[in-house]
Amino acid sequence: MMKVELIDRMGTDLSVVNAARVSYSKTKDVFDGKDEKLIKYLAQHEHWSPFAHASLQFRIKAPIFVARQLVKHQVGLVWNEVSRRYVDFPPELYKPDSWRGRPQNSKQGSDGEVKLDQTINHNMETTMESCLILYNSLLQKGVAPEQARMVLPQSMMTEWYWSGTVYAFARVCNLRCKPDTQKETQDVANVIDKLAGEAFPYCWMYLRK
């Protein structure tokens, strides 16, 4: 089961406008309508640096194939992940509720549900289980976890801390909340979108496109 938690945050919408106004040696204690207008202006004209003074920290659990899409976002973000070099507890594997078809006119994304017979679904279950059995056998034979992990599938669940600026996470969501994003990745991005919007409502309103 995938999971997204907001662990920590630094700053508020007011922090962003105060970072912008310091250029004129001014700050405010209470957020008002003028501050909203300033945030809107900063976002529309891509003055990104004030938004880098506010940040979010998430803990995320998702399958490897989702994590490897999201880790491509590097600017303004840092990532620390569970390492199978150091741990060898039993892996958890992701299993989809349904299968989606290949789209007709695109190299990415997916279409409607594809019905598979029980044999194929059984083969998937068996293959995943075989990977876990082989992994455990290698460990029992004394193989190092850093090498034994090579037999684990991309459906293996992983966890990571993901921290970054409000601006950086808005860029993630602007790309990964789109309909043509892989659904599983989109599911993670949609939760980030919701939590970030609650933490920084005005910044998020104008940074999200």
Language-model segments: which ranges?
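Family-specific signature for flavin-dependent thymidylate synthase
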Residues: M1-K209
